[in-house]
């Protein structure tokens, strides 16, 4: 079934066309600093991880993980292999991060490891990758109550190192399973004109064995391949589908398909089939070559030329028959058997100079052999339509666009992104949204029982979208708008992480070093403000605040909750109190 082309429906009441911008506020933000017992387990890119995709996936990795099921609880993994947790009850009485789990093996001995990754699957389940290719499914008990010992329920080596980007917990017919989405970047030996790497998304389902209440095993393993790291990828809460936002499409690789095949997207078929015949043409005639079985004779061949048709039989077996693209001189057309066991047919065109796009109408069994000299002549005839320069004279006649209105920060260098939904059973694409120039900004978990939301730039605004897998006709809901944030963030060249509060009260971004920018939603004014230009009272204002951290270490992690911002560096964890009203 062909995928449905969909669009994202913007809710007009959530837009503010009269938004005037953010006002810089100098109100101080309470900031607290914790020194870590051991440094964060940062894994730097190796010399062989040189592509942009490696940088997106691993170089910009967020080492701080927020437990969406329990507000203000964050985790990180240190270089001793410990998962450390900080749960905030009171800002002024912060305790030290505590160890909740320790990796069973010393991963620092692995030269080719990636950063360890963790995802909070449910209130009592966690999935973990140690960065060496081993997957753990861990039962944590109720993390919101008194701390319980984390217990490994499943662990298995899955090949090359990967990171976990999403997971869900499923309970169907009293059978518990955990679905996990893994990401790898692997070498593509046959890719001669690309980066030499491809991105692999693996959808793994781990299910409890019926005969053993504590034994889990892999029951499903799907692989998708693409040429770009997805901006967003998540499994639907019911496990029936997968949504991906990426600027290059992903394709499902079936289990029996050769995994070493070329990933060239322009290739229409995955398996190269030898053409039944080859043909070439000049302005006056066509030559068709058909491979014959050994020891074929003229008596085995029957050919009928008609002005608009051709019929070829070999030992009474139909080889080629159908309507020709254009008329031929059937009396002047000939055929002969060559020494290399091939049949050569010469067809004389009635309409000289007409170039045929196909030999027999609708027939796909042949291959056109193009003459290099002919291709050069065609290119020369089309030369006046092309240029080596991009719009070499934009001011001539009518310019293509008003270059003065286009700012440098508005230029997108990536290709047009798309949002795709894959069915979990058939693995076919069911819905496609062409995002065009709607730049992906960030994702956030608003409700942990739902899929993560994603934020896209629409004109100057940033719009937050909540996927709903249960609504087939309207799968993506516009739930919030951050006014002018799409435009504002584009000018922040050094931004590293982007986030927003789950209640949409503010959005925040941090740079690679030290600075954090906070953009609040418009709030009512406590005093009267008058706009003299428009002659009206201003009822509310949107504030911008800037926090500067007292550190020279690069920022490795960034998470936002309704009340706080958490910022992780190599040696410190900073807590910024953003909202004080309860």
UniProtKB/Swiss-Prot annotation:
Coiled coil: none
Keywords, in A-Z order: Cytoplasm, Nucleus, Phosphoprotein
Positions of the CS domain: 272-360
SUPFAM superfamilies, per database record: HSP20-like chaperones
Domain of life: Eukaryota
Database matches in InterPro entries: CS_dom (IPR007052), HSP20-like_chaperone (IPR008978), NUDCD1 (IPR037895)
Pfam families: CS
Compartments, as annotated in UniProt: Cytoplasm; Nucleus
Modified residues (Phosphoserine): 7, 387
Gene Ontology cellular component list: cytosol; nucleoplasm
Protein name: NudC domain-containing protein 1
Organism listed in the record: Mus musculus
Taxonomic path: Eukaryota, Metazoa, Chordata, Craniata, Vertebrata
Gene behind the chain: Nudcd1
């Amino acid at each position: 079934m062909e995928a449905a082309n969909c669009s994202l429906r913007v809710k007009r009441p959530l837009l503010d066309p009269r938004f005037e911008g953010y006002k810089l506020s100098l109100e101080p933000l309470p900031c607290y600093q914790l020194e870590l017992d051991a440094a964060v387990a940062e894994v730097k890119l190796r010399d062989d991880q040189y592509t942009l995709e490696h940088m997106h996936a691993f170089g910009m990795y967020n080492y701080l993980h927020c437990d969406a099921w329990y507000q203000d609880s964050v985790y990180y993994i240190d270089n001793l292999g410990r998962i450390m947790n900080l749960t905030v009850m009171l800002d002024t009485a912060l305790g030290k991060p505590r160890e909740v789990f320790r990796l069973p093996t010393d991963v620092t001995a692995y030269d080719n490891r990636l950063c360890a990754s963790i995802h909070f699957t449910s209130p009592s389940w966690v999935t973990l990758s140690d960065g060496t290719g081993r997957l753990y499914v861990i039962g944590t008990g109720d993390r919101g109550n008194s701390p319980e010992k984390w217990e490994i329920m499943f662990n298995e080596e899955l090949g090359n190192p990967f990171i976990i980007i999403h997971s869900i917990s499923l309970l169907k017919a009293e059978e518990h399973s955990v679905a996990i989405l893994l990401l790898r970047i692997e070498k593509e030996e046959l890719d001669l004109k690309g980066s030499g790497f491809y991105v692999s998304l693996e959808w793994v389902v781990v299910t409890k064995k019926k005969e053993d209440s504590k034994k889990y095993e892999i029951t499903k393993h799907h692989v998708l391949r693409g040429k770009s790291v997805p901006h967003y990828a998540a499994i639907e809460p019911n496990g029936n589908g997968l949504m991906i936002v990426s600027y290059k499409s992903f394709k499902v690789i079936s289990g029996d398909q050769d995994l070493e095949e070329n990933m060239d997207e322009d290739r229409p078929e995955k398996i190269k089939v030898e053409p039944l015949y080859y043909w070439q043409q000049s302005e006056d005639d066509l030559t068709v070559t058909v491979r014959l079985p050994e020891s074929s004779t003229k008596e085995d061949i029957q050919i009928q030329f008609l002005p608009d048709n051709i019929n070829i039989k070999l030992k009474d077996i139909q080889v080629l028959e159908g309507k020709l693209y254009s008329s031929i001189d059937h009396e002047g057309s000939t055929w002969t058997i060559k020494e290399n066991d091939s049949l050569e047919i010469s067809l004389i065109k009635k309409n000289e100079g007409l170039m045929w796009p196909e030999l027999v109408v609708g027939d796909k069994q042949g291959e056109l052999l193009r003459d290099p000299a002919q291709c050069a002549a065609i290119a020369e005839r089309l030369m006046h339509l092309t240029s080596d320069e991009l719009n070499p004279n934009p001011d001539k006649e009518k310019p293509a666009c008003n270059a003065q209105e286009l700012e440098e920060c508005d230029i997108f260098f990536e290709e047009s992104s798309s949002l795709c939904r894959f069915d979990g059973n058939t693995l076919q694409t069911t819905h496609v949204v062409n995002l065009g120039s709607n730049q992906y900004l960030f994702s956030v978990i608003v409700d942990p029982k739902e899929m993560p939301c994603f934020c896209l730039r629409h004109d100057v605004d940033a719009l937050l979208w909540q996927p709903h897998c249960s609504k087939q006709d309207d799968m993506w809901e516009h739930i919030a708008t951050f006014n002018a944030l799409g435009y504002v963030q584009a000018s922040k060249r050094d931004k590293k992480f982007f986030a927003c509060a789950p209640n949409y009260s503010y959005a925040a971004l941090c740079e690679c070093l030290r600075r954090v920018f906070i953009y609040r939603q418009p709030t009512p004014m406590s005093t009267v403000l008058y706009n003299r230009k428009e002659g009206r009272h201003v009822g509310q204002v949107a504030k911008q605040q800037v926090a500067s951290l007292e550190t020279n270490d690069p920022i490795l992690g960034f998470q936002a909750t309704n009340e706080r911002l958490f910022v992780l560096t190599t040696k410190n964890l900073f807590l910024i109190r953003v909202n004080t009203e309860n």
